[in-house]
Design a protein with these regions (language model features):
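Charge-dense, helix-prone N-terminal extensions
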Residues: 1-160
Length: 160
């Protein structure tokens, strides 16, 4: 019996490990996750003021590599036009749009976490509920007129 308890304790003490793309195991956060947390800490320490969010978001979009930059510029224009009540701000280093200081939606570049697509995500503040199951993030490979129309509808519903 004591031997069983010992094995259980050892199993509990082991930390979660994940395998990286190179086949190595690592503990904790990825470099991208740590960078996002550092950006969030800087955002929280930054002085607050009207208009600061818009300029910070536009500056962040300008830093993005293509095609994320063009997509970010277009999304910014779509979200501002569809929901003028949302305030742009940075959130974990990503362009985000908030109502009363709470993020409703955000844009994550493909480059941010080395994924094959960018993401338009919505928080629990967004009114997108549809029964017991609904999407809260959408993969973006390109923005055609069809995708733009869907985003307009999603953003309007999110703030309704």
């Amino acid at each position: 019996m004591k031997q069983g308890k010992s094995n259980t304790r050892k199993a509990v003490k082991k930390s979660a490990r994940r395998t990286t793309a190179l086949g190595r195991t690592s503990k904790g956060f990825t470099a991208e996750e740590r960078a996002a947390m550092k950006e969030r800490l800087q955002e929280l320490k930054a002085p607050k003021g009207k208009g600061d969010g818009e300029s910070a978001v536009l500056a962040k979009i300008a830093e993005m590599p293509e095609p994320d930059r063009t997509m970010g510029e277009r999304l910014h224009a779509i979200i501002k036009a569809s929901a003028p009540g949302l305030s742009p701000k940075l959130w974990y280093g990503m362009p985000a749009y908030a109502r009363d200081g709470k993020v409703v939606c955000h844009f994550q570049t493909a480059q941010k976490f080395n994924t094959r697509y960018a993401t338009l995500g919505f928080s629990d503040q967004a009114n997108l509920d549809e029964g017991g199951l609904w999407p809260v993030a959408f993969a973006l490979k390109e923005l055609t007129a069809a995708e733009e129309a869907r985003i307009v509808a999603l953003v309007k519903k999110a703030v309704s």
